[in-house]
């Protein structure tokens, strides 16, 4: 693609990140994946966590050094903030900002709090982003298999003159130089990431699956067959698209399936849906969505909890759980073990 620069391991100085002490704040999905990959790449990593908490125990079980967040910030050259978006600003204000010193690096894996101004860093620190384009469990599993996931890097403030090089070095240390690293901006990453999640990857996809499932069940079809046709098989199709684009997917499926795709797809995802997508994007660009999310979480997340409970209670979850527990393919090589990661 013209104008697209992809950085690989041979473009990057890995020794740069190895010369710094890295404090990873948080041990959720990304904290788990990134900190262990950094450790295995020979980096000097410490974890800033609530001492005695569940994450602290899990991190110690992996042989990682943990301490309080203020102590980790004081010791580190790089502070990678990997706690949930909704609590980053408060933790930053109370535990990180008072312990910052000039020349340190504040790092993020999502530009949300910087882009929307919930965190306002001092002018004498570097602010960078390394955003793996996969959940943390996949960041870890791909690294362990000798591969990596692509990452985006961005620079918001560069006091040192080497912020981009350091971001690239960090990305390589978590395995992304094996696959490819792309430069972007905090604005572009934040807005496209939120839109992708809401319109396709999470919101659009889950709503499409559930609506199609309901349509078949309400028409009298077995919920088990409905699950297989509109949910289980989705991965098989997405794998084809992931590897070779929509064209390769069309090449692999039957003429009947392709004709149905080309003649019926746009009847479902039509101009009205595109108009709604533009509204979703406008809310992201204006900051309206960001403020709504932060206000909801600050007020206790009552509506969020109700929506989450309704989703968990959908018939497709019961049917899916029953089907998955009956097949061996679901028990092998699971990425997520909630007791460990």
Where are these regions (language model features)?
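NAD(P)+-binding Rossmann beta1-loop-alpha1 motif at the extreme N-terminus of oxidoreductases
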Residues: 2-66
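Short, flexible, solvent-exposed loop/turn segments with mixed acidic/basic and small polar residues
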Residues: 37, 68-71, 139-146
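A short helix->loop->beta-strand "cap" motif at the edges of active sites that frequently abuts
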Residues: 43, 100-104, 123-125
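Rossmann-fold NAD(P) dinucleotide-binding segment
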Residues: 69-119
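Rossmann-fold dinucleotide-binding core
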Residues: 107-198
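Active-site-proximal catalytic alpha-helix in oxidoreductases
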Residues: 161-165, 174-175, 180-219, 224-242
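NAD(P)-dependent Rossmann-like dehydrogenase/reductase catalytic/cofactor-binding core
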Residues: 224-341
